[in-house]
Every structure is written in C-alpha cells, then in structure tokens.
UniProtKB/Swiss-Prot annotation:
Domain commentary: Has the structural arrangement of an alpha-helix connected to antiparallel beta-sheets by disulfide bonds (CS-alpha/beta).
Name this protein carries in UniProt: Toxin TdII-4
One of the record's GO cellular component terms: extracellular region
Functional summary from the UniProt entry: Beta toxins bind voltage-independently at site-4 of sodium channels (Nav) and shift the voltage of activation toward more negative potentials thereby affecting sodium channel activation and promoting spontaneous and repetitive firing. This toxin is active against mammals and also affects neuromuscular preparations of frog.
Organism whose genome encodes this protein: Tityus discrepans
Length: 27
C-alpha cells in the first residue's frame, strides 16, 4: 500500500522517508 501523510483534514499521499506520522488508507 501507499503511505499517506496524516493531516488535520485527513490522509494525504506522502513520502515514507519524511519525518512525519503516517496512516494507511485511501482517499
């Protein structure tokens, strides 16, 4: 699956190498 960046508005497609929290989902 693709990594999605966790943001206040939901999950945005993000890079897994970035220092941030992630969730797995589809939007």
């Amino acid at each position: 699956k693709d990594g999605y960046l966790m943001e206040p508005n939901g999950c945005k497609l993000g890079c897994l190498t970035r220092p941030a929290k992630y969730c797995w989902x589809e939007e």
